[in-house]
Amino acid sequence: MSYTLDSLGNPSAYRRVTETRSSFSRVSGSPSSGFRSQSWSRGSPSTVSSSYKRSMLAPRLAYSSAMLSSAESSLDFSQSSSLLNGGSGPGGDYKLSRSNEKEQLQGLNDRFAGYIEKVHYLEQQNKEIEAEIQALRQKQASHAQLGDAYDQEIRELRATLEMVNHEKAQVQLDSDHLEEDIHRLKERFEEEARLRDDTEAAIRALRKDIEEASLVKVELDKKVQSLQDEVAFLRSNHEEEVADLLAQIQASHITVERKDYLKTDISTALKEIRSQLESHSDQNMHQAEEWFKCRYAKLTEAAEQNKEAIRSAKEEIAEYRRQLQSKSIELESVRGTKESLERQLSDIEERHNHDLSSYQDTIQQLENELRGTKWEMARHLREYQDLLNVKMALDIEIAAYRKLLEGEETRFSTFAGSITGPLYTHRPPITISSKIQKPKVEAPKLKVQHKFVEEIIEETKVEDEKSEMEEALTAITEELAVSMKEEKKEAAEEKEEEPEAEEEEVAAKKSPVKATAPEVKEEEGEKEEEEGQEEEEEEDEGAKSDQAEEGGSEKEGSSEKEEGEQEEGETEAEAEGEEAEAKEEKKVEEKSEEVATKEELVADAKVEKPEKAKSPVPKSPVEEKGKSPVPKSPVEEKGKSPVPKSPVEEKGKSPVPKSPVEEKGKSPVSKSPVEEKAKSPVPKSPVEEAKSKAEVGKGEQKEEEEKEVKEAPKEEKVEKKEEKPKDVPEKKKAESPVKEEAVAEVVTITKSVKVHLEKETKEEGKPLQQEKEKEKAGGEGGSEEEGSDKGAKGSRKEDIAVNGEVEGKEEVEQETKEKGSGREEEKGVVTNGLDLSPADEKKGGDKSEEKVVVTKTVEKITSEGGDGATKYITKSVTVTQKVEEHEETFEEKLVSTKKVEKVTSHAIVKEVTQSD
């Protein structure tokens, strides 16, 4: 510790320092004394070391605490000295230092007192700890003595334990020996018990034997007694008999005896008698023995002789017994089989009865369902009639609009003709041709309608004969036929008046527009409303008139067909058209004979009629009827379906609604793909052939132009068709069973359609021989008939035939030939959901129709909104380009060129809409 001079000079500080030193000495002394006072004992080294450690800890703690306190006090002194030295004045500084020193001294004294108390406390604890250490040392000494005693006891106990174990082993051996002895004794005991039981059983048996023997003895005694009695009785009897005999003898020899008596004794006489009797008895005995011996010998001989027979008899008996047992066993088995068979028979009878009842129930249910379907057919016919009425009204309105449009068009054409000479010059000849063609075609329209109604009536009559329900249906169909005839006649008359101006422009386009005409009428009419362009409306109206002409030409008599052929005489295929018509007539006759099959097809047609009516466009029913090759089948008349081309599609109408749905949308009355397909293939034969011939004269390029022109309206139709199919597939699903029945007639219908196709392909295919060959092959194959324009079309038809979509392809190809590739696009969309553009491209050849056909986009468009129209417009724009290329070459040809121009402008407008 460091102390300043000031602090040492100060007496109070010196006093404090000395006190701290003295306290330090005390503190340091106390531990030393405590350390010395510890008692050392000669215990175990562990105890000594522990006590030493504990004794050393306390003084060290005390010493360290004392040192800390001294250091603190020194610090305090240094601080106080610094305060004293740092004072400003001698007087004030001294007072302050004194007051501070007092406070510091008080604090230090308090701390010192606390340290002293702590030291006393620690000394007390050291004493207690030393006492504990001493006690522990004593305990350790006592524990050592106890350990020796315990060890001795443990040794003794171990010895005793070993002895006990030895004794235990000996006892265990003894117990084992005893157990063996016990086991052995048990065995002996059991054996003795068995012997005792055996002896007791023998005793019981002997007792029984004794009892039996005693009984036998008693019986024998009784027999002996009875025999003795019998012997006595026999003796008495014998004696009596002897006495009697003697009496008799004596009586007979009385005199003699009397004499003898006098001489002999009775005893001698008795002896003589006895001797005589004995001699007689001996003789009798000998005789009996001899007889017995002889008899016995004879019997033994007979027995020996019969032994063999007896043995054989015994063997036979044994054999018979064995056979009897086997037969009895067989009998039991046969009885079991009989019972099982009877049970099976009863089960089979029960099952048969149950099945019979179930079949009867199913038959009843089917009959009820048949009645219900017939009533539904009647209801659908009524709905169909109502829709036809609506259609006729709409046709009238369309005709009125057409007149207005024609008037405007004539004014526009006159105005344009004054400006552009060549175009004006082309129009007048076109109007002449249209006037000539339309009246011829429209007149057959009425006839075609009559034929369609009559066929329905005949088929329904056949059904009436079968059931009363069918009679009701026939009545309904007759009423419908009358109303349809009237309405159709009115519509036909109006159409005949109106389409003259339209045919002037559309004369060359009749063939491409024919198949799509019904659809073009409705759907292009909607386009006209949306776009507000009169040019497309005129095209739609022209298509309507063309379709009406087609339907009329097909259903007219041979005279009307001859007229159509004269008109078609301009082309090279007039003979082919006549042949196709003759084939159609033959098919009509064959189908009239097949009334039963027609009835089924009539049901199908009836079911399909309401569907046709349901579709928004009413144009198709009239056109379909006109287009269908006369009464080939109600399906063809109603559906005009190339669906019959492959029965797969009819069946697939419900499962594969893609084609039926879109096709239905294409034509309101179209039953499904049937109408669209029928529209293209069937009507081509009479009227379309003429139109196609005219087109052939113009060239295939013109046909392609017309196809392109129609692609836009057809695409718009596709949109509507896609919307309509949603409701149609459900109807077809319900009608699918009835449609499947009509498959047989459908095949015949396809043949007629094939004939038409062949005619058309021949007309168009004279420049192209390959197309004709493919169409002929398609007529044979069924699915390859219609794809004839190019080799690619044939291959595509085959692919579609696998999917049940051949009908769509056939229609598409036919339409592309005469009416434009627009149909192919629509139907391709319906069936495959894929682009049929490759087929169209191949058909187009060098005209770049590939750009026009994009069927996938058509499928995506389900609404009639501007989006779907825009996509179709894009196609029409490409068509416009193609048309422009051909316009230069074919301007001299009829209004087709003019219509191409109109379509071009319309397509351009649509293109602008798309870009927006």
UniProtKB/Swiss-Prot annotation:
**A family per Pfam:** Filament
Residues recorded with modification Phosphothreonine: T571
Family to which this protein belongs = Belongs to the intermediate filament family.
Compositional bias of type Acidic residues: which residue ranges?
A: 493-505, 521-541, 562-582
Sites of Phosphoserine modification: 30, 99, 226, 346, 418, 467, 483, 511, 545, 553, 558-559, 641, 646, 680, 685, 736, 783, 821, 837
Q: Where is this region: Disordered?
A: 1-51, 485-851
Q: Where is this region: Coil 2A?
A: 266-287
Linker 2: annotated segments: 288-291
List compositional bias (Polar residues) regions by residue number. 1-10
Q: What is the lineage of its organism?
A: Eukaryota, Metazoa, Chordata, Craniata, Vertebrata
- Alphabetical keyword list: Acetylation, Cell projection, Coiled coil, Cytoplasm, Cytoskeleton, Glycoprotein, Intermediate filament, Methylation, Phosphoprotein, Repeat
Q: What is this protein called?
A: Neurofilament medium polypeptide
Q: Does the keyword Acetylation apply?
A: yes
Modified residues annotated as N-acetylserine in this record: S2
Ranges where the record places region 6 X 13 AA approximate tandem repeats of K-S-P-V-[PS]-K-S-P-V-E-E-[KA]-[GAK]: 614-691
Q: Where is this region: Tail?
A: 413-916
Main subcellular location:
cytoplasm
Q: Where is this region: Coil 2B?
A: 292-412
Compositional bias of kind Low complexity = 21-44
**Molecular function GO labels:** microtubule binding; structural constituent of cytoskeleton
* Subunit description: Forms heterodimers with NEFL; which can further hetero-oligomerize (in vitro). Forms heterodimers with INA (in vitro).
Where composition is biased (Basic and acidic residues), the residues are 542-561, 583-614, 686-701, 707-742, 755-778, 788-828, 839-851
Q: Where are the sequence repeats?
A: 614-626, 627-639, 640-652, 653-665, 666-678, 679-691
Q: Which organism is it from?
A: Homo sapiens
Record InterPro entries: IF_conserved, IF_rod_dom, Intermed_filament_DNA-bd, Intermediate_filament, Keratin_I
Question: Where would you find this protein in the cell?
Answer: Cytoplasm, Cytoskeleton; Cell projection, Axon
| Ranges for region Coil 1B | 150-248
Q: PTM Omega-N-methylarginine: list the residues.
A: R42
